[in-house]
Amino acid sequence: MANVVVVGAQWGDEGKGKVVDIYTEHADDVVRYQGGNNAGHTLVVGEEKVVLHLIPSGILHEGKRCIIGNGVVLDPEVFIQEITRLKDKGRLKDDRALLVSESIHIIMPYHKRIDIAREAKSGEKKIGTTGRGIGPTYEDKIGRRGIRLMDLLDRDVFARKLKENLEEKNVILEKLLGDKPFTFEEIYEQYCGYADILRNYVADTSLILYNDSKAGKKLLFEGAQGTLLDVDHGTYPFVTSSSTCAGGACTGTGVSPRDIHEIIGISKAYVTRVGSGPFPTELLDADGEKLRQVGHEFGATTGRPRRCGWFDAMVVRYAVRVNGLTGVALTKLDVLNDFETIKVCTGYTFEGKPLADLPANLAVFEKCEPVYEELPGWMSDISGARTFEELPEKAKSYVKRLEQLIGCPIVLVSIGPRRDQTIIISNPFQDKV
């Protein structure tokens, strides 16, 4: 038995969806544990491209149970839209193959309006929110004002909580943000309609996962975003609002830490970031644009162009430490095919002095200078390789050097968007990483 957590080891968009899709073959349950529809997973199945924002990637596999845990925040409208699209494609034939925690917090229309209005008023201090209402929903969760799915299913409880929230939210919208308020009626009936559909998917998911793990079933936990976007361990305040690190898999599902056996971090062979915040290896030249175009670096959720830079070993080494990574899956190695020289950041300096680790102080992080090591490129198409030995020597040397720098074994190498364009060195469900 092995229960595996998959986390992003950089600033998100590392290719977790593809890796989760591959690992799903070996799992019984696939579980989302944090975030919301602010993150997109892009999967390529045969000739079919599927983008999911809420539903776990495992939904494309027959016979797997997909679970959305209590640590996620749920937009009912988006959730229902994804279900409809999947059913239109002939997927999700059994509704009970997809379960949602009864304790999950619900994204309300006022959350989205507040999110957008705040960002509009931020000027140069923009965080880079997707405007999906994720942050304000987590605020209400922590402030104990949130509306959970179990509340939504009880019309009387929902009505009371909605009225209480609107008294406060309308003041914020009108007086502080200069936006229009909501009426009770326009939200209540719409969300009661959502509740009638959601009722088919509600469950005590923590208990289900406990029983499945106890019975020897294999659990796969699918993280969203990345380590450097974690609300506690990321580049605060340029972070998301949830726990993206491996610890979030426990708090976001109700699964015991003792029931987590392997933790795999996903990292691109270079690095990208969306939105504002420090990014020491960012490339603002032709190399950065080349990475963006060849790697199709545009957000699955927002369509925004991603900032691109050379691989940052400091970032991934930090992810190894705070997550307790047992292995790293390296994605998009093929994007580097046509670079004669590839740079790798091995460390930072601040005011001329080397730093031992990532600085927590944002003002320091923004002024860090990367220390680079240059490696020769392989200048050939590697997308046809199916074993590590089939890669060009210079490509193998690049992977091995990254492994040395991050202090963690690389267990998978992705060399293209398709599932078969993957080199599995070690499988966390079958091998001891």
Swiss-Prot record:
Bound cofactor: record note: Binds 1 Mg(2+) ion per subunit.
Catalytic reaction annotation: IMP + L-aspartate + GTP = N(6)-(1,2-dicarboxyethyl)-AMP + GDP + phosphate + 2 H(+)
Gene3D superfamilies xref list: Adenylosuccinate Synthetase, subunit A, domain 1, Adenylosuccinate Synthetase, subunit A, domain 2, Adenylosuccinate Synthetase, subunit A, domain 3
Cofactor(s) it depends on: Mg(2+)
Binding residues annotated for GTP, in chain numbering: 12-18, 40-42, 306, 332-334, 414-416
Residue numbers binding Mg(2+): D13, G40
Pfam family, one: Adenylsucc_synt
Protein name: Adenylosuccinate synthetase
